[in-house]
């Protein structure tokens, strides 16, 4: 159903570890300084200079120590300046099996192959430059295209491109999610 596709395409939100915001002025530039905060226990584990500087899957530059496994950014909320992080390479917040590209952000190179609402097709999709192609279903709905990957993809971030290809590796279309 459309509701299920929307739910699957949204990043999973976790409250494992997040940041608490403090705002101050530094010179002429307004900077939001925040603290990493472990929600269940209120334990502060670090600081950062703004959610806008972090991407999903980022591990470097977090300056959080004392954990068994590496800490990764699993979600960001830039308007509220919150960063959610999780521990370990296999944290479920790092991967998603579905993403949505809004209708206005879809570009068909092969306009003769553009999908109609309700249509489902099988393509090979890439979400990063030089990434291997991955099998996925593209599902066209009035509010956009949903890409449902066979294998969940790691580090899907807003603002990235997805490009879909035919079986003979011809790029057919793309979009920003």
What are the roles of these predicted feature ranges?
Residues 1-177:
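AMP-forming adenylation/ATP pyrophosphatase catalytic core
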């Amino acid at each position: 159903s459309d509701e299920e596709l929307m739910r699957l395409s949204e990043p999973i939100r976790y409250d494992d570890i997040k940041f608490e915001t403090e705002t101050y002025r530094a010179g002429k530039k307004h900077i939001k300084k925040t603290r990493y905060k472990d929600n269940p226990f209120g334990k502060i584990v670090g600081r950062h200079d703004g959610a806008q500087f972090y991407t999903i899957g980022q591990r470097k530059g977090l300056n959080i120590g004392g954990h068994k496994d590496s800490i990764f950014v699993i979600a960001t909320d830039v308007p509220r300046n919150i960063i959610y992080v999780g521990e370990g390479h296999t944290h479920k917040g790092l991967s998603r099996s579905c993403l949505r590209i809004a209708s206005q952000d879809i570009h068909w190179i092969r306009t003769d192959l553009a999908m109609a609402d309700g249509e489902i097709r099988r393509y090979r999709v890439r979400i990063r430059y030089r990434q291997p192609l991955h099998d996925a279903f593209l599902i066209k709905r009035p509010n956009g295209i949903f890409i449902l990957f066979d294998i969940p993809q790691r580090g899907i971030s807003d603002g990235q491109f997805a490009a879909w290809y035919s079986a003979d590796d011809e790029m057919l279309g793309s979009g920003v999610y």
